């Protein structure tokens, strides 16, 4: 999004979402920045490509940044899984970006939580990620979240398309 000669901002989505999670922000930021919204393997349009690891994803994004952004970003942002990838990128190259925003990410390994999450998705994934569950979640959003956090219609369509395709491994 935006002119690729402007300062680069990369926004990395969390697990279960895709680039569209940052669509509203990208449209606003693109007036002054080149906004990059990668889709992680196993998500969105990349749902058929297995997500392997944070490290492999960091390798892929680092290559992209080297090839298309001169090896440097103005800002690097990530939420949840995206934030963990941001931390991995910054561990490898601390001067990769001028600004970093990390939200809702684990800062140190939590193997018990990981096992619990894997088991929960394995046991209840069909209840959490089915089209019916996604429609129900979208109906609850306006009731549970501040109005500005609820997905607009355009993003709801992406959500309904992509969430049921999310691999449950």
Each language-model region and where it sits:
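Conserved HGGG/HGGXW glycine-rich cap/lid loop of the alpha/beta-hydrolase fold
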Residues: 1-47
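Structural signature of beta-strand start/N-cap positions in the alpha/beta core
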Residues: 8, 34, 73-75, 98-99
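Active-site micro-motifs of SAM-dependent methyltransferase domains
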Residues: 17, 42, 83, 107-108
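Active-site signature of alpha/beta-hydrolase-fold catalytic machinery across serine-
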Residues: 24, 88-92
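Active-site loop/oxyanion-hole signature of alpha/beta-hydrolase fold enzymes
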Residues: 36-77
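Gly/Ala-rich beta-loop-alpha elbow adjacent to hydrolase catalytic centers
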Residues: 78-82, 86
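Flexible "cap/lid" loop of the alpha/beta hydrolase fold
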Residues: 91, 97-129
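Conserved alpha/beta-hydrolase catalytic His-Asp/Glu region
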Residues: 111-113, 131-169
């Amino acid at each position: 999004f935006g002119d690729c000669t402007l300062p680069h901002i990369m926004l990395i989505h969390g697990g279960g979402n895709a680039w569209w999670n940052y669509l509203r922000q990208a449209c606003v930021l693109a007036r002054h920045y080149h906004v990059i919204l990668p889709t992680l393997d196993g998500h969105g349009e990349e749902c058929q490509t297995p997500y392997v690891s944070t490290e492999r994803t960091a390798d892929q994004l680092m290559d992209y940044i080297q090839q298309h952004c001169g090896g440097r970003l103005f800002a690097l942002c990530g939420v949840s899984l995206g934030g963990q990838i941001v931390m991995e990128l910054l561990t490898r190259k601390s001067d990769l970006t001028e600004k970093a925003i990390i939200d809702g990410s684990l800062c140190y390994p939590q193997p018990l939580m990981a096992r619990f999450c894997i088991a929960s998705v394995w046991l209840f994934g069909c209840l959490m990620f089915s089209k019916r569950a996604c429609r129900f979640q979208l109906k609850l959003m306006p009731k549970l979240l501040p109005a500005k956090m609820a997905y607009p219609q355009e993003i709801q369509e992406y959500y309904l398309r992509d969430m049921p395709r999310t691999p449950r491994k």
